[in-house]
Amino acid sequence: MLVLMALAAGCAGHKKDYPVTPVSFTQVRVNDAFWAPKLETNRAVTVPFALQKNEETGRVDNFRKAARLMTGAYQGKRYNDSDVYKVMEGAAYTLMLHPDPQLKKRLDDLIAVIGKAQEPDGYLYTTRTIDPGHPAPGAGQERWSNLRVSHELYNVGHMYEAAAAHFQATGERSFLDIAIKNADLLVRTFGPGKRRGFPGHQEVEIGLSKLYRLTGHPAYLDLAKFFLDERGHYFGGEKHDPKDPFAVYDSDEYLQNHKPVLEQDEAVGHAVRAMYMFAGMADIAALGGFPEYAQAIDRLWENVVGKKMYLTGGVGARDTSEAFGDAYELPNASAYTETCAAIGNALWQQRLFLLHGDAKYADVLERIMYNGLISGVSLDGMSFFYQNPLESAGGYGRSAWFEVACCPPNITRFLPSVPGYVYAVEGEALYVNLFIGNTAAVVVNGRTIDLKLETRYPWDGAVKIAVGPDKPAEFAVHIRIPGWARQRPVPGDLYEFADASDEPIALSVNGAAVSIDLERGYARIKRTWKKGDVIDLLLSMPVRRVVANASVKADAGRIALQRGPIVFCAEGIDNGGKALNLALSDRAAFRAEFRPALLNGVVVLRGKARAGNSSEGGKISSPKERDFLAIPYYAWANRGAGEMEVWFPRIRD
């Protein structure tokens, strides 16, 4: 094996990393009324549900067949192995937060089967091991022969992430050793002077970086960079007839292979692939010390956030190829905005924050998390959206599972990691990025700081943070002041508030007002802190009208509603059976009202709308005033399918 050193020694030897360090989700205990129930539903419902679905659909049986524990043909798509790994990662994170002997045994049993399915040299791709002569369509006739399509590297990238999570949760090496054995095979196979190629679906780069973090072995990070650097330089591999269903993989734009990654300045192609690639590039920038990678993803960020992101934080406009569209191409009814793309975007935004320490990335992260990401899972945790459009004529409903089931497993692994997005540390500074009720123990410059954050966010903008160092100590607390509270729904000019708000932001320590002098979007409070100190932040939450950049043709003459970080929508069930016939007047007033019995407890917006007959171009004819109710976008389609609208025709009067 390549890895001979002790894992801890490898970690200690790192010289480069992200300048900002996130506080691990294992150090943060979420207890608020918004996120805590979602995390518990994921633990108690969604993770077991997804584990069972992997059994029912033959995904786990594929490993048993590869291990010769049972006979039969491979079932499903060539990438189905990855769904097993992703749910295992989510289960491992869940174990860290909530020890569960039965869940651990289930993971142990799966790991044992995966180990038996692995070939002697480390290769792990069940469809080829089961029947080397007839693997699933797209797998290629030989190992690595069809990397654009096969997902051989994508699958094991998710395996590396799951194995790292399992090791961190249990301290046991059973899964990690399987991952290392496979990664060592990749190191022997690919690289300068060896086999050329790149993964058709990015992900292995992230997984290799995680293995590097755990082992300290530079070959893993070098290989991640090699795969990225091959893009735009290597054009080999199998090709397809234009009528072949796999012909889309011949498109270099679809795979982000149209230019070298360091020259790319526009997000193109498959959105999930792009998000995973950008996140992987951030890892190389930080862990490898390559500033040119940071410069490249900074350019790409300007393009995505400035021209290609939905108000909900979703990305990927086209259902054809699940891809980005042109600049400002953001249709609502046909928006693809895949749940996996939202998760990938969140992973990327967090890495950009860790690189730069700027609140604008946390602003985008918050928008994604509270809107276009959690819309992907139902409130009961048992049905899902693959796509997350911003308009529906009633044809969209949630599904219990999918043949291409990447999104539900991705939800299971993201949600338990949410506590890890709240705080971060840089030198003698503590960052407070998300306002999620919790208790935490955070180490700042060698001192342990007990924190208690209390809030009803996102329904209320009052935030109280009790700061308790083990002994009096001087350090800085950087509190993010959200862009939405500073007249900016998003960084840049893709979206703006149509109405002004002069409601102040109030910040105090122990009851004494503190002036807010923003630095990269943070209110910075540096003082000698002692037990019992309390920070109070008050963010006003008026209902705001949002307008899109004039170049976004789909939103021309329309407005959306936002309060705090939450984007709202109207559903037909609350508005006389229809939502697409509603227009909103500039003079209409909306009031926020908390309804504890609705949709697990939400704030709704009530007011008046004009209802009439909708027509092409979004105009409403013969409008009449009627009562109007809007709910948070993330909660739509939890009461059955029906009409839904985010962007409403605007009546200027």
Question: PLM features: residue spans?
Answer:
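Extended ligand-binding groove/face enriched in aromatic
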Residues: 67-79, 85, 89, 95-202, ...
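Well-ordered alpha-helical scaffold segments within catalytic/enzyme domains
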Residues: 27, 33-37, 88-101, 157-172, ...
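Solvent-exposed loop and edge beta-strand segments that line ligand/cofactor-binding
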Residues: 16-19, 66-84, 137-155, 188-201, ...
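C-terminal motif of bacterial Sec signal peptides marking the signal peptidase cleavage site
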Residues: 9-10
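Extended extracellular/luminal ectodomain segments enriched in beta-structured repeat modules
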Residues: 471-477
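C-terminal beta-rich recognition modules with glycine/proline-rich loops and embedded aromatic residues
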Residues: 224, 297, 363-371, 376-468, ...
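Low-complexity, Ser/Thr/Pro/Gly-enriched N-terminal "stalk/linker" regions
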Residues: 13-83, 108-134
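Non-catalytic carbohydrate-binding regions of carbohydrate-active enzymes
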Residues: 288, 292-336, 342-397
